[in-house]
Structures are given as C-alpha cells and as structure tokens.
Amino acid sequence: MVKLYNTLTKKKEPFTPIDKDHIKMYVCGPTVYDTAHIGNARSIVVYDVLFRLLKFCYGKVTYVRNITDIDDKIINAANEKNSNIESISKYYTKTFHEDMESINCAEPTYEPKATENIDNIIKLIESLLQAGHAYESNKHVYFSVESYPEYGVLSGKKIDELNYGSRVEVGENKKHPGDFVLWKPANETDYKLSSHWNSPWGEGRPGWHIECSAMSYAYLGKDFDIHGGGIDLQFPHHENEIAQSKSAFAESTFAKYWVHNGFLTVNEEKMSKSLFNIVKVRDLLDSGIKGEVIRYALLKTHYRKPLDWTENVISESQETLNKFYRLLRSTCIEESDTEVSKDFIEALKNDLNIPEAVAILHEMATEINKTSNEYEKLKLTKKFVKSARFIGILESSYQEWFASGVSHQEIERLIDLRKVAKQNKDYDTADKIREQLKQMGVTISDNEDGTTTWYGKLSPIVYR
C-alpha cells in the first residue's frame, strides 16, 4: 500500500484513491521567465518518481503539470530584453523541456498553459462572483477570504494573523487585506507587450492563483487525488487554490492529498539573485556534469527534507553512480525479463522514501560483488538495473557512461590497475583492462618512459 504525507492532515496516510482505476495528479509547474534552477528541478524530479510509482501500482495515471506563461516576472523579462511575453515564454518553455529531458524526467500527461485557458479562468471567476465569494473593485476582481470560513486549513494561518505585505499582496481596492486578485486591469506595459485579454471586467489578465484552479478543473475535474508542489507554494498559492476551488464547487473536496517537497539551499543559504548563488540546471550541464548525476543528487535526500546543494553533493553523486556503473562493465543488460526489487518498491511506497530505496541499491551492489556464480550475478545485476532505472538512473551503458569525458578518474583508475597488473606480470588481467578501456571508447599507448597516453573523445592525456 502506498503511503504519503498529507500536508492537509499533517500526517502520513495510506493512499486511498478516489478511483483506483484512474489516478489524477496536478503539480504546479514552472513560471517560464528564465532557465530552470535546481530548486525548480527538485520538484519536477520528485513528482516524476511519484508519477512512475503510481503508474506501477495503479496503471492509469493522469498527470497534469501546468506552465505559467503570463506573470509579472515574464513581463519584466520581456521588458528587460525588449521582447514580448510570447517570445519569452516560448523560449524558456523550450529550455525547460530540454533541461528536464536531460535529467530523465518523463513528460506529464498534459501540460496546459495559462494563456491557453483564459476562457476557463474567466468562467471560474464568474462562478465565484455569482456565489458571492468574489467582488469587483476599480476594474479588479478579488476573492474575499472572509467569505470562506475554512481559509487557512492547509497552512494553519488564521486570517487575522496573516503578515500582509510579505507573501500577501496588499491593495487599496480590497475589502480585507487578505483578499487576493483574480483579475487585474491592463496597464500601459500590458498593452505594450500584448499581455492582456478581453473580459467582462475590461481588458486585463488573470491573477496567479486562479490559473491553477481553472486548469486543474479543466483537465481533472473538481475532485482529484494529489496536488503537488514545493513547500514554498503552500502559502499563499495552494491555500488560495483551495479557497477558490472549494468556493466555486460547494460539494468539492478539491485535492484529497497535498504533497510538498522541501526547500533547497545553496551552501546553507537561500538561492537568490542578490546573493549571486542561483544554480541553473543548464549551467551544470554545460560544465560537463551529467544529467543523471544532477538527478541523483536531487533524489538522495528525502523529498520532504531540506536539501543543501554543495560541491560535495555533486562529487558524491558522481562517485556513487560510477560505482553502480562499474557493476555493468562485463554485462550486456537486457532487464525486460526481470522485476524491480520488491524491497525497493516497498521503500518507495513508504512516503516516497528514495534514500531507503537507494540504500537497497547499495545492498544489491554489495551482493553482486560478492557473488561468484556468473548466472546468479547476471540475475542480480538485471534486478539491480531494473530497480535503478525505476527512479531514472543507470539509463546508459557502461561504455557510454565512462566514455563521455567526465570520468577521467575512472579511466585513470583502470590504467593504474593495469600498470600494477603488468608489474606483477599478470598479463591476462592487463589485457582484459586494455579491452575494457577499448569498449569504453578509450585507446591506450604505452610509452618507453613508462607513462601511458590515452585517447578518447577528449584530447589525449599523458598519464604518469
């Protein structure tokens, strides 16, 4: 049985789907004004693994992850680049897709864009107005938090205790400081950048919170199983989604389970432009770090715990994956005829405990190394690979992994072993290592002075 920590009830619960034959999940996706940073990527990777697990356990899963392609940040980026919102959002949506593909994230079932759902947004706002949960004020439309008695059910915040002006937008047109905008009138910049649409309240654009309520309803209906996102979205975004959606549909439970991944810091500091410490996925990839290493680094800490990003996180992840890939050096793996480790799946079922699942991979690796029977070794290795690939790692072959130019250490480690073998006159082992290097795409040449030169996809390097 799958168990998930439900932020709504503040406890880990057995996952009981609304319809066991069709699981529905909505996750807040990116605001496409810049390339994705590792905080964005952590959320995408976490829910990618949850998506895989739910499909494995239940079969049919509809996974909706939105794109916010109209927002103040996008408008500011368009202004700064002397561009327009369509060009900015299209470009950064494309880079987002490329970066997420590089870290082995599957596409969601649907990926709706806010700008393609303006009609749905307007209809939902009209429903809230008709039900008395929203009001017009100076060409704005606001949601009235006082009209929804359960406001604060997710975050535990009470209306009269909110810190207005921090995460809550303050406005002169509101009846209550906690009221949030559903529709805002177009300003000069909106007209300049074409970031406005016609509505019953005049030309304007939607507020952020109403977009997700409208898109989740359009693609999943008024009730669905799981709503996911980063813990930073719990308030006010997710709190406001609940208020909107349950006010629009009186009998609705909206999302049954609320799942939140933890914060990500860099060297124990919050990522911010002012600290110049924003780590972009694309920059990591361009520096030669493999997408699989980035993915593993984002998964090795439990999804609900804070993750501190340091140089050690990357180096340790690279080292672990190198260790895992070495198990494949003499084996051509076709894992279609084997099953994922049951213990591995049970770990994932326990509130997506990926660190526990990874610990099981390490145990399997130890067992593979200890096994002398070749048939048993092959059988164990197949199960090991099948399990690892379940969370999106070990997707390459041994040769591909170590011939990519990142793994100097592995090449030099093998050359060291070959040198020792030759010194011990163990020429069979030396020849096997030469062949192993050849399979990795590395050619070696022994020099008269005792050094070895190796050639791969990179420039030749003299190893001493």
Curated annotation (Swiss-Prot):
Cofactors named for this entry: Zn(2+)
Binding site for ATP: K273
Keyword line: Aminoacyl-tRNA synthetase, ATP-binding, Cytoplasm, Ligase, Metal-binding, Nucleotide-binding, Protein biosynthesis, Zinc
Chief localisation class: cytoplasm
Cofactor binding summary note: Binds 1 zinc ion per subunit.
GO BP: cysteinyl-tRNA aminoacylation
Family: Belongs to the class-I aminoacyl-tRNA synthetase family.
Assembly and oligomerization: Monomer.
Name the record gives this protein: Cysteine--tRNA ligase
Organism annotation: Wolbachia pipientis subsp. Culex pipiens (strain wPip)
